């Protein structure tokens, strides 16, 4: 296998840590004095400076110094964790403990090894996009002989120089780790196999150098091309060196004396190598003088990151060995290593990966549905589709029933208008109907549902039909107009005058006179385009639609005829413009002179196209239609303001209505997972002013529609995008994550602390920014939090700097039109019932 490194090597010093253990029981019993003290996190001090013959420095500084009470977890987290985790990124690394006997080397390395391997496994579990392989091996050097700790035969192994891997141990056992329990089992085997013995200084003294190696290899799980098919391979070594000792202190003899000689000789060679490396590689460095230095050669100034933990005893009896350890540490911190990322990009590895991919594809081609699980999945999918089809058929049948019912009710309503015409000078002809003329049943395909004073009816195939309060009568009754006028009762006249707002007695006389003048030309009422510009045309005073009867239409969506002729002779200064209605099918009539489906005055019609599903109304298109309706209603209201009656509504009740609607919108925002930026703009722009009624109503109906769609498991179409409850929740999560990144950019440190305090976030907690954005707009019932949330989001998105540009976000102009700016405060609530 061909191994290459990244062209740029990272050059760094060896990390040197010093750990000073407390006095043990034997030293305390012997009344030993502690001559060493850690004065800060980087410096250790020798306190007995008055001792004779002391020519050593009294203070030593290193990367990190740990007192006796510091746990092994802190030593790992602060010092060696970063180096140990380099192995999963393709960088070789080594961690070893150096020190005198009974100073705590084995105790320290046991904890470091377990913590590091646990973090390596956590990293592997969190990065499932790559395939990892972890191999475990362990050896010991006992009396200059290499033994395999995973083998019980005790055979001595040989060292071999490999051109690719460097110095390797022949026939060393490598176990592929399965899980954490497997690792614990192997570590217990190594502990049992290692040579230990009892001396006067330590009851369990390590008599050999132990080296545990983890080799981590990772590659992408999917083939992403030759350039991306790289494999990373690196090793991490955990080395527990035997402690240096004096024979006079250890009182060793025989086997223990021989072991101590080999240990001291290998440690002396290691110290010589470290001292020469600290001087900049001047002269020959003989790594081959000891098997220990030969194995550690890559770790000492080579392709690896290295950390050395020097363990010390504070006892006065060990002061000379402690100073020797500190001198070794001072030389080690000057040694430089050049670690590289080991990337395997050989043609063999690429060929092997391509062969595996080819074999997998061939297997899928041979057995596309051979497994029982695949057949079961296919059968399950077919059953699900059948159930969906049956459900949709039932829904279609129900929608057709609702369409037929709505059409029949519409026909009955038109007949009622035709047969209940009453006449009086100055009063228009219209049917005896109430504000709510149908029982509230609305087609499920309707885009907006409103059961209060206005209703939307859909035939299931055409666009939703909006019936405004209009004053209509049949043109077939024009000839009998003079006969009907005298016979109309006064009671009925008064009732109709109460229903039609702002009709005065003077206007009634004027309308009656105009009606008498135009009665001689009833054909103008039926004209669709001939007299559109004439001064005597009735269409110039009343903007209405001429419809044909349902029996003569060309499509199922054509409405009945005889609806659109308004009352005649209204004065020019008080013209009323009604919103035009357009249907999905072309309206035709065999006996008509020209197309009667167009507006007689050329007024633009409100088009409400269907969504992609055919049954979902586009909210944006509907809002554009409401904008046009609002303009025309403004003209009506402007005319009414010039001397007409208004119902007096108390300001307190209007304020309560606004607060109720706003609270309902806040709760629907939370239910439908609406964007936080959308909530902020809407909350800050609409304060209950006179022109806000339109947008409050539109937003409320939009949210009700989305809530109903989500509760039934359906999709909602908004802005050309299909929304579901899951997708809206996902978009809201993405938006919160984006806002969390802006917190550090928009607010200073003091501002962030103040905001965290407002939202109850602890200053010393983690991921405070993410906690903050998760708290924004989280409680719609707490108006204080709502205002604070709007303020924070507005500052994050710089709402004040964007000005009027952001007032187009709903497809409407948020600035009130000129005809609304002169009206009384709170008058928007009065005009709401007449807008839809």
From Swiss-Prot:
Gene Ontology molecular function terms on file: ATP binding; microtubule binding; microtubule motor activity; mRNA binding
GO terms under biological process: microtubule-based movement
Residue ranges, compositional bias (Polar residues): 588-607
Region annotated Disordered, chain positions: 422-460, 588-611
Binding site residues for ATP: 99-106
SUPFAM superfamilies registered for this protein in UniProt: P-loop containing nucleoside triphosphate hydrolases
InterPro entries in alphabetical order: Kinesin-like_fam, Kinesin_motor_CS, Kinesin_motor_dom, Kinesin_motor_dom_sf, NACK_C, P-loop_NTPase
One GO cellular component, as annotated: plasmodesma
Superkingdom as given in the UniProt entry: Eukaryota
Coiled coil: 344-420
Keywords assigned by UniProt, alphabetized: ATP-binding, Coiled coil, Isopeptide bond, Microtubule, Motor protein, Nucleotide-binding, Ubl conjugation
Record location of the Glycyl lysine isopeptide (Lys-Gly) (interchain with G-Cter in ubiquitin) cross-link: 707
Domain (Kinesin motor): residue spans on this chain: 13-335
PANTHER family reported in the protein's UniProt record: CENTROMERE PROTEIN E (PTHR47968), KINESIN-LIKE PROTEIN KIN-7F (PTHR47968:SF18)
Family note: Belongs to the TRAFAC class myosin-kinesin ATPase superfamily. Kinesin family. KIN-7 subfamily.
Full protein name: Kinesin-like protein KIN-7F
């Amino acid at each position: 296998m061909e191994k290459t490194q990244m062209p740029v090597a990272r050059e760094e010093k060896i990390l040197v840590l010093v750990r000073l253990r407390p006095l043990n029981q034997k030293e305390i019993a012997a009344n030993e004095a502690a001559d060493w003290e850690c004065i800060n996190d980087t410096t250790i001090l020798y306190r007995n400076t008055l001792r004779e013959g002391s020519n050593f420095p009294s203070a030593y500084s290193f990367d990190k110094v740990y007192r006796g009470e510091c746990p092994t977890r802190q030593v790992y987290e602060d010092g060696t964790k970063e180096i140990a985790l380099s192995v999963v990124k393709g960088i070789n690394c080594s961690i070893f403990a150096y020190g005198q006997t009974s100073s705590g080397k084995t105790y320290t390395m046991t904890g470091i090894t377990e913590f590091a391997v646990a973090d390596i496994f956590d990293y592997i579990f969190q990065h499932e996009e790559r395939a990892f392989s972890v191999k475990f091996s362990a050896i010991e050097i006992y009396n200059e002989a290499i033994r395999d700790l995973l083998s019980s035969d005790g055979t001595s192994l040989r060292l071999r120089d490999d051109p690719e891997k460097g110095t390797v141990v022949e026939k060393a056992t490598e176990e592929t780790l399965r899980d954490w329990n497997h690792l614990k089992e192997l570590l217990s085997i190594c502990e049992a196999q290692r040579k230990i013995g009892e001396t006067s200084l330590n009851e369990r003294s390590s008599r050999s150098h132990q080296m545990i190696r983890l080799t981590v290899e990772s590659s992408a799980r999917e083939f992403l091309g030759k350039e991306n098919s790289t494999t990373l391979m690196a090793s991490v070594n955990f080395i527990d060196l035997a402690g240096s000792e004096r024979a006079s202190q250890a009182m060793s003899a025989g086997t223990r004396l021989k072991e101590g000689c080999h240990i001291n000789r290998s440690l002396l060679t290691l110290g010589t190598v470290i001292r020469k490396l600290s001087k900049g590689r001047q002269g020959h460095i003989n790594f081959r003088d000891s098997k220990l230095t030969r194995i550690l050669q890559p770790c000492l100034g080579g392709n690896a990151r290295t950390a050395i933990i020097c363990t010390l005893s504070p006892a006065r009896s060990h002061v000379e060995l402690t100073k020797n350890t500190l001198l070794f540490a001072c030389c080690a911190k000057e040694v430089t290593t050049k670690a590289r990322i080991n990337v395997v990009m050989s043609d063999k590895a690429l060929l092997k990966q391509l062969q595996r991919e080819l074999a997998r594809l061939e297997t899928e081609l041979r057995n596309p549905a051979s497994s029982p699980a695949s057949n079961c999945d296919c059968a399950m999918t077919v059953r699900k589709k059948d159930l969906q089809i049956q459900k949709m058929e039932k829904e279609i049948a129900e929608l057709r029933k609702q369409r037929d019912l709505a059409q029949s009710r519409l026909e009955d309503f038109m007949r009622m208008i035709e047969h209940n015409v009453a006449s009086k000078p100055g009063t228009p002809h219209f049917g005896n109907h109430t504000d709510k003329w149908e029982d509230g049943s609305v087609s499920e395909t309707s885009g907006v549902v409103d059961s209060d004073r206005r209703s939307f009816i859909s035939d299931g195939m055409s666009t939703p039909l909006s019936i405004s309060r209009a004053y209509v009568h049949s043109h077939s009754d024009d000839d009998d107009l003079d006969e009907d006028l005298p016979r109309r009762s006064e009671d009925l006249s008064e009732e109709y005058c109460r229903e039609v707002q702002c009709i005065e007695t003077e206007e009634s006389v004027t309308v009656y006179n105009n009606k008498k003048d135009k009665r001689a030309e009833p054909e103008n009422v039926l004209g669709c385009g001939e007299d559109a510009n004439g001064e005597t045309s009735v269409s110039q005073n009343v903007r209405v639609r001429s419809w044909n009867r349902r029996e003569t239409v060309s499509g199922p969506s054509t409405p009945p005829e005889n609806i659109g002729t308004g009352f005649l002779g209204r004065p020019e200064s008080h013209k009323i413009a009604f919103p035009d209605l357009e249907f999905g099918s072309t309206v035709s009539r065999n006996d008509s002179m020209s197309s009667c489906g167009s507006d007689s005055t050329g007024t633009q019609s409100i088009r409400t196209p269907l969504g992609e599903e055919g049954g979902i109304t586009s909210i944006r298109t509907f809002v554009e239609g409401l904008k046009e309706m609002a303009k025309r209603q403004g003209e009506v209201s402007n005319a009414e303001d010039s001397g007409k009656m208004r119902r007096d509504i108390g300001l307190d009740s209007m304020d309560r209505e606004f607060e109720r609607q706003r609270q309902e919108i806040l709760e629907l925002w939370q239910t439908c997972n609406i964007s936080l930026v959308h909530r902020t703009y809407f909350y800050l722009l609409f304060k209950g002013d006179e022109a806000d009624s339109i947008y409050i109503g539109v937003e409320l109906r939009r949210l009700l529609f989305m809530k109903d769609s989500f509760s039934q498991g359906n999709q909602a179409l908004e802005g050309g995008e299909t929304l579901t409850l899951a997708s809206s929740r996902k978009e809201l999560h993405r938006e919160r994550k984006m806002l969390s990144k802006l917190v550090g950019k928009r607010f200073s440190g003091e501002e962030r602390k103040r905001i965290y305090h407002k939202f109850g976030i602890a200053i010393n907690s983690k991921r405070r920014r993410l906690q903050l954005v998760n708290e924004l707009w989280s409680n719609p019932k707490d108006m204080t939090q709502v205002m604070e949330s709007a303020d924070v989001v507005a500052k994050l998105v710089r709402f004040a700097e964007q000005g009027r540009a952001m007032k187009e976000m709903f497809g409407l102009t948020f600035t009130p039109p000129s005809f609304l700016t002169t009206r009384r405060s709170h008058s928007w609530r009065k005009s709401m019932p007449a807008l839809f």
